Amino acid sequence: MKRNILAFMAVMLMLCMSAQTSQAQLKRFSIGPYVEAGFPTGDFSTTHNPGFGVGLGADVKLIAGLTAVGSVGFDYFKGKTIDNGNTKIASAKVIPVRLGLRYQLISILYVKVEGGTANFTGDYNNGTGALVAPGLGIRLLGLDVEGKYEAWFKDGTHGFFGLKAGYNF
């Protein structure tokens, strides 16, 4: 029994020591939550109010300055009542799944382009469409703030300007 406990303690000690030395190395992978605000444009702005979203993003460093990024989230845009209060548009509830690339321009400034699917749920435009989302942002330590334009393509274009803030671990 003592031998098992000593062996376990030795393994734990080695893991702790290796974790301390690996913290000095650069992280190649990070993951973290984000929140975003969306401001509809075009026809989407006539039928929906500004919305919000939450989600989880991840990134993997590839080569100098280039990073693969991905995220999954939930966006909500409340529908408007139009035509003198006679027509109520259903709220847009969307689950976007994005994959893309981020390129570091200078130390904290980056450009990013993402593509993927927009899964509409609920009564508004139910089904799956494509999405594209170019953006410009800053990343300082774990804090990530991005301005972007995102367009969902299903039965027309549903576009919005967004402000996204997240923290990566």
Please name every model-derived segment.
Residues 31-35, 70-72, 99, 111-113, ...:
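Membrane-embedded beta-strand positions of outer-membrane beta-barrel proteins
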Residues 35-43, 52, 72-78, 93, ...:
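Transmembrane beta-strands of outer-membrane beta-barrel pores
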